[in-house]
Amino acid sequence: MKLLVVAVIACIMLIGFADPASGCKDCSCVICGPGGEPCPGCSARVPVCKDLINIMEGLERQVRQCACGEQVWLF
């Protein structure tokens, strides 16, 4: 039990001294993705979102028709 308490305290101390955003200091990495600028080679958020929604709707239609056996008129 004492070893567990010591380990937990040591972890808390190590986490407290660690820099969570540490990375390379000399690289020119730019944060990209959903919260910022689009990553290189990616479209803006709205077109990507629309494309993904269309893909998911098509997949849902295939699952309902082919795997579940629903008739087309039910969609």
From Swiss-Prot:
<dbReference type="GO" id="GO:0140073">
    <property type="term" value="F:bioadhesive activity"/>
</dbReference>
<dbReference type="GO" id="GO:0005576">
    <property type="term" value="C:extracellular region"/>
</dbReference>
<protein>
    <recommendedName>
        <fullName>Salivary glue protein Sgs-8</fullName>
    </recommendedName>
</protein>
<keyword id="KW-0732">Signal</keyword>
<feature type="signal peptide">
    <location>
        <begin position="1"/>
        <end position="24"/>
    </location>
</feature>
<dbReference type="GO" id="GO:0007594">
    <property type="term" value="P:puparial adhesion"/>
</dbReference>
